[in-house]
Amino acid sequence: MDYLEKLQSLMENHPSDFFSLWEEYCFNDVVSGDELIVLLEKIKSSSIAPAFGKIAESVIPLWEQLPESEEKDKVLSLVFDIQTTNSKRLLELALQQVKKYEDSPNYKEALRIVGLRDGIFFTHCLRHFALLMHLCEGNFVFHQGGWGVGEIMGVSFLQQKVLVEFEGVLTAKDISFETAFRMLSPLKKDHFLARRFGDPDAFEAFARKDPVAVIECLLKDLGPKNAKEIRNELVGLVIPEEDWSRWWQSAKIKMKKDSHILAPTSSKDPYIFDPKGFSFISQLQASLSGSNDASKKIASCYTFVRDLGSELKDEANRQFVIKELKSLDLPADSALSIQRAMLLSEFLGDKSSELDCENIAKLSEDQMFDIVNHIEILSFQKSFLSLIHSCSPAWVSVFTKILLTTSTSILRDQVFKALIVDKKARESILEKVSAMIEQPLLYPELFVWLFLRVVSGEDGLFSESDRKEIGRQMLASALEFMHKVAGSPQKDLGKKLYSFLVGQRFLAIRQIIENASIDYLKEFVLLSSKCPQFTQGDLGVLRSLAEVVQPALKRRVAEEENILWTTSESFTRMKAKLQSLIGKEMVDNAKEIEDARALGDLRENSEYKFALERRARLQEEIRVLSEEINRAKILTKDAVFTNSVGVGCKVVLEDEQGEEDCYTILGPWDANPEEKILSLKSKLAQEMVGKTVGESVLFQGKKHKIKQISSIWD
């Protein structure tokens, strides 16, 4: 344990031992400014600060050994923050230190304010004096109480006040010097926060031109930050939200080659700025020595040679990486040994017999499949697949197996392109397509991937004429797939299909259903209505698209969809509500407006504003309610049919455990979820509508069977 750690551990719990060790520390021949600053800041906020204040002068000999720098000034400022003796020696030292400001017009007044003129009490004098000298129009400060960055708009040494405009406050604030000493910290004009607040447009342009420099500035001024924290500091303030992902990806690539930013090992760890810079090879050495995991060592070497290929121009660096890789004890013909061989061969010019065609051809089908799945580096997976294709007679079987099982689209692309060129493999894939059309859940990820390619015309399997019909068959299967996976672990695949189908204003669907038969379109509309991913608006668009293709699909009575079903009781209640809105609340509101107008100036009249806003709300409510009443149709016994689920029906659902629930389907005015009365437009009701006894519905992720349908009048 070094001095810093020992002193920090003794500070609170063993003060007497701390002061004994401090005496020993003062005799150090080598002084670290960073270490001294950390220690003094800890002391300043600790319980021993008053006691240490009496011996604060003991820091001066250590301070004198430091080279001239901001670091040295910081140490002395901390000494004066802690000291309590106000000795003559310290006074002389302080006066000498502030002499650099003597050309300032407020120099003498500042001496008086911080206590250096009379020399009686001058704790904190250097920090306070530096702040006073910084208080000039156009400079920036940071408010410790939550107001953020501020720009100085004016200062009066006579009144001892400063006027500051803060980013977190609507109006400029007058702050006394006494408060400023406690709450404000000076910011240089090139500080990250000052640049972001002072000229955001110029800072955004700079960030787009040199993203690494901006992140260096951020980390240097604000300290280590992880990716999420960096995003919070930049997005919306420097980089617009819509541009963030692209900008950040570009910045990350460039940061890998920056010797001042140490990248984290995980997303939760911070990026660290090192002003002195570091050696990439030393960073690799540290990474390799700190791990016994062969997989991690190979990954570290791969990242190094991929991102920092220029470092390999130094032969010593190249030989170091080769030596480290060859020293790994790996089983032959394993995924790790194959990765090492590829790394040595492709990046380091050290060819390995392990990659010879003879050796690849000797591997069994299961061995090759296992190696591909256990190679962690994607580019090496692709390279090994190319070797299998070139060298192994069993490549078709291996590629087919990978096509059916992999979740990596890049690998699926590679094996698919190779397979469709081979006649037998192509026939096998066509058989798999037919099987997936019948059972899309047979190979769910492959089905979704292939459907997207077929619709986009990028499958390479079908002719233009065949693709149209296959696309329609696959669309029907896709809708069935979306319905079945909605509440399953594969629901993300359903969301992916949904995004594709509704994208570009339903372009894929418009292309597929073009010139389709009326029977197909009826099935299409029915299947889409069962997919919970589609909103009511989506379903309306899908029906409209189908009706454009086959106008005969249009309902005989166009108004049917627009009917708002209601019971007679609810109809009477809503008419009474409309009368109340028109005859009472609007009249009362008119009086409110007149009363508020009588109060005077309408620009500053909040009562008038609120009254007008209430009038607008009432008018909108009256408009909507009037429209609904005009569309309303009272539900009668003759309008309810129980051969399938519809409005006015009571439906008994039975789950897989045999438990039953009864739901009533009525219009939106009568809906009451607590009493299990559903609106006809609700998701569950729409899931049930049109179905008959014995059919299943998906509710809360579970299957329920329709056991009974009856009328509300039964």
UniProtKB/Swiss-Prot annotation:
Coiled-coil segments on the chain, per record: 602-639
Q: Domain of life of the organism in this record?
A: Bacteria
InterPro entries given in the database record = GreA/GreB_C_sf (IPR036953), TF_GreA/GreB_CS (IPR018151), Tscrpt_elong_fac_GreA/B (IPR028624), Tscrpt_elong_fac_GreA/B_C (IPR001437), Tscrpt_elong_fac_GreA/B_fam (IPR023459), Tscrpt_elong_fac_GreA/B_N (IPR022691), Tscrpt_elong_fac_GreA/B_N_sf (IPR036805)
Give the GO biological process terms.
Answer: DNA-templated transcription elongation; regulation of DNA-templated transcription elongation
Question: Can you give the residue ranges of the GRAD1 domain?
Answer: 1-502
The annotated region (GREA) lies at 561-714
Which PROSITE patterns does the UniProt record give?
A: GREAB_1, GREAB_2
- Which is one GO molecular function term here? DNA binding
Q: Keywords assigned by UniProt?
A: Coiled coil, DNA-binding, Transcription, Transcription regulation
The similarity annotation says:
Belongs to the GreA/GreB family.
Q: HAMAP family attached here?
A: GreA_GreB
The task this protein performs is described as:
Necessary for efficient RNA polymerase transcription elongation past template-encoded arresting sites. The arresting sites in DNA have the property of trapping a certain fraction of elongating RNA polymerases that pass through, resulting in locked ternary complexes. Cleavage of the nascent transcript by cleavage factors such as GreA or GreB allows the resumption of elongation from the new 3'terminus. GreA releases sequences of 2 to 3 nucleotides.
List the protein's name.
Transcription elongation factor GreA
**What species is this protein from?**
Chlamydia muridarum (strain MoPn / Nigg)
- What gene name is given for the protein in this entry? greA
